């Protein structure tokens, strides 16, 4: 429902467990052109210990992308597209597309794949636009057993495949393939 209620030309998603720096929106908006996605600096921490930054694959991706003049969805930036947070997205990219609520896990990644056919350019902020990603031990990502993860991954792979092959000319094969690999990885490593 939140997407339908959003007003304006760009949308920022912030998970209810997470928070952002005071300059987050201002810094992100300063790079918005209307047809680009803007990504920021991700800072991961365990609940109750925000002063201790955790190693985080998306922070590593940020460090590899920052300072580059051209950032592609096939670059390390693809790690940012496992979910809608940590970025500003043009509302036009989303249109009538919505999260698939049949999925308890993976719906964020599926949504981002669904809108990936719209991605033209990616811009990256300086490190002071921070998205603080909080890890909680009781998060939905940690609560499913292997049988549930396997079933969910199969359903996700099926949906990625349906979207890709229905509009094969619009979607990037490498990005599609990395979503399939990510779904398989989620079975073993939640």
Predicted regions and their residues:
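Glycine-rich, basic loop-to-helix element that forms the pyrophosphate-binding segment
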Residues: 1-6
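Short, high-confidence coil segments that cap the C-terminus of an alpha-helix
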Residues: 8, 34-37, 119-120
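The conserved acidic donor/metal-binding loop of glycosyltransferases
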Residues: 15-19
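Conserved nucleotide-sugar donor-binding catalytic segment
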Residues: 66-145
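Flexible acidic/His/Gly-enriched loops in nucleotide-sugar-dependent glycosyltransferase catalytic domains
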Residues: 21-93
